[in-house]
Amino acid sequence: MGFDLYGMKPEVDTPKPEWTKADPYIITEKEGVMQIDPQVKEEYDDFMKEQWKWRDENEGSYFRSNVWWWRPLWTFVCRVCDNVLTSEDYERGSSNDGYRISKTKTKRIASRLRKLIDSGYVKSYEKWYKREQGKLDEKDWDKNYPFSTAHVKEFERFCEKSGGFEIH
């Protein structure tokens, strides 16, 4: 399971690529499964590469994190933004059911994270987190949940430019 966050009104620098042709997916007769039509596969693959490039260039449009990375990040954000986010935000942000975090809140999250990054707090927290993880038994599931300053920085940029976001 992963968490896909979509900016609701992202600040964009370039136009978003759009697929203007018919639905590229077909259902195969033999297996009865959905796949990309072989006649448009190469063109659709190129389109998807452009989509990913656009997402990378427009930081507020999309943020993704697998469950292992998301949980420590979201827990950290909720702790350091406890006067910004509600307990409902914390609970619903731990699920990927389309919950929304407003533009006002995401701007405040970004501002707080930026201050904590610039002050060195996030780096110190990362060191503490890794030290505590190192004390865990190898069989402890919590050992599989990483945390990094780089991930916080990426999330801060997304929050700053997302215009609010939905969690899927």
Q: What label would you give each PLM region?
A:
Residues 1-168:
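Acidic (Asp/Glu-rich) sequence patches and key acidic residues
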